[in-house]
Amino acid sequence: MGCFHSTAAREFPDHENPVKLASETAFSVSEVEALYELFKSISSSVVDDGLINKEEFQLALFKNRKKENLFANRIFDLFDVKRKGVIDFGDFVRSLNVFHPNASLEEKTDFTFRLYDMDCTGFIERQEVKQMLIALLCESEMKLADDTIEMILDQTFEDADVDRDGKIDKTEWSNFVIKNPSLLKIMTLPYLRDITTTFPSFVFNSEVDEIAT
């Protein structure tokens, strides 16, 4: 958990105490305070209501409020812990914690499993992996032939689906990740280790600030 000793932790009206959030995450109090500045910037980019809606989240992640993106939608759904269609500051900090370099392998593995388990069945199915792969390729502007995508899916399930039931359960996914740690690269944002030295450059992109002004 983060170092949460502070003599002058700021209070954020209508939001959770930074000391409390630091005690529950890998962030220090000063890092939580820096995250609050980021949260304010994102949450006011479209509607200034102290909450992050899906449009603001997509704008922060991908600089584009018009283009729907499955990956962004899934991340938003996982951040939206209370299922209200918006993200409050507490959920924002706790959810970002899984991307911290000090977050455990277990936390990161669980998050990626839920990311791919789009139907919330407790299993990752081939079509879910295909949808996510296509979404990630589109976002990176990479193009792969359909047969290449199918080959990737075949190899993934050959390696991960140990009991050959056509789906990947949590145990199979955990073992697959251990053998293929590169799968978790997206789950670590190094600058989360000390946001206070990188803010305001720590932001998914700088366009949020430009739109807010």
From Swiss-Prot:
Pfam families: EF-hand_7. It is found in: Cell membrane. Induction: By drought, cold, salt and abscisic acid (ABA) treatments. Ca(2+) 1 binds at residues 117, 119, 121, 128. Changing residue 201 to A: Loss of phosphorylation. It comes from the Eukaryota. Ubiquitous. Colocalized with CIPK23 in root tips and vascular bundles in the stem and the leaf, as well as in guard cells and root hairs. GO terms for biological process: abscisic acid-activated signaling pathway; calcium-mediated signaling; pollen tube growth; response to water deprivation. A lipid is attached at residue 2 (N-myristoyl glycine). The record marks 140 as: Involved in dimerization. The modification Phosphoserine is found at residue 201. GO terms for cellular component: cytoplasm; plasma membrane; plastid. CDD domains: EFh. Disruption phenotype: Hypersensitivity to abscisic acid in the early developmental stages. Ca(2+) 2 binds at residues 161, 163, 165, 167, 172. Disulfide bonds: none annotated. Keywords: Abscisic acid signaling pathway, Calcium, Cell membrane, Lipoprotein, Membrane, Metal-binding, Myristate, Phosphoprotein, Repeat, Stress response. GO terms for molecular function: calcium ion binding; kinase binding. The N-terminal 12 amino acids are sufficient for cell membrane targeting. Homodimer. Part of a K(+)-channel calcium-sensing kinase/phosphatase complex composed by a calcium sensor CBL (CBL1, CBL2, CBL3 or CBL9), a kinase CIPK (CIPK6, CIPK16 or CIPK23), a phosphatase PP2C (AIP1) and a K(+)-channel (AKT1). Interacts with CIPK1, CIPK3, CIPK6, CIPK8, CIPK14, CIPK16, CIPK18, CIPK21, CIPK23, CIPK24 and CIPK26. Acts as a calcium sensor involved in abscisic acid (ABA) signaling and stress-induced ABA biosynthesis pathways. Contributes to the regulation of early stress-related CBF/DREB transcription factors. CBL proteins interact with CIPK serine-threonine protein kinases. Binding of a CBL protein to the regulatory NAF domain of a CIPK protein lead to the activation of the kinase in a calcium-dependent manner. May function as a negative regulator of stress and ABA responses. This is Calcineurin B-like protein 9. It comes from Arabidopsis thaliana. The lineage of its organism: Eukaryota, Viridiplantae, Streptophyta, Embryophyta, Tracheophyta.
